Amino acid sequence: WDGRRVHLPLRCTVRGEAFGQPDCGTDMVFDFAQLIAHVAKTRDLEAGSIVGSGTISNVDRSKGSACIVERRTLEQLDTGKPITPYLDFGDTVRIEMLDNDGRSIFGAIEQKVERLA
């Protein structure tokens, strides 16, 4: 954390396979001070408010992706067709960020795609 951006990788897995580890601060267009200022123009913010920065991606493609649509678009541009499948019933997505000592910052978020009953 540099006061405006978190500079750690977001570990993303899809179907139990590594999908990406983009660095959250690298290539971030708007820092959190700018995001909070913008959000505060249209609503009250209180302690505990959560402000999201949108999807995370890096210019350096070797870091992988945190967004299936972004990856499919890059594949379309590179090869003429998307390769990565969309999520299907039974698929699991997991994201987690670890600090420099390997401790989870916010706990892993893991969700499974299931049919509504």
Residue positions per predicted region:
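Catalytic-pocket segment enriched in acidic/His residues
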Residues: 1-117
